[in-house]
Amino acid sequence: MTDNMRVEVYWNLHKHLFSVRALEGPNKGRVISHSHGISLTDVKFAVQPAGRERVRREGKKNVHAFVRGRIANSGFEDCRENFSDEKITYNPYIYDTFVNAKTKEPIFKTDCVEMDVMLEDGKRYPRILSFEK
């Protein structure tokens, strides 16, 4: 993974980690990493409606929600200088889109996100923080 590379990231239900899929370069369309954490800039939140409806219909989760952006190995400090961090969540049984966890307002894009794995009661779950410049 290189700095500024376009990727899409999703929560891997089997590995309990983030899967990172390349959106450009020789590995375009392939998972290039599994990670406990990643930072992205120029971020868009995407939910594929057909996948979401399939989850609701069948009661089984599938990969259909992504955080897309550019890898920020360096330069992420710009986002953190004057940031207002907001926790972002998505639950296909409740929401149609990613939402601000506090206000429940839909969110479709942001300047930067920091994604990491949290441990609570012995269970791993994803945490996504949104940062606006």
Regions found by a protein language model. Give the residues of each.
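Acidic, low-complexity, intrinsically disordered interaction modules
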Residues: 15, 19-120
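Short acidic DE-rich linear segments
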Residues: 129-133
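Detector for methionine-enriched segments
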Residues: 1, 5, 115-118
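Structural detector for short beta-strands of small beta-barrel domains
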Residues: 2-12, 69
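Short beta-strand segments
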Residues: 5, 29-32, 127
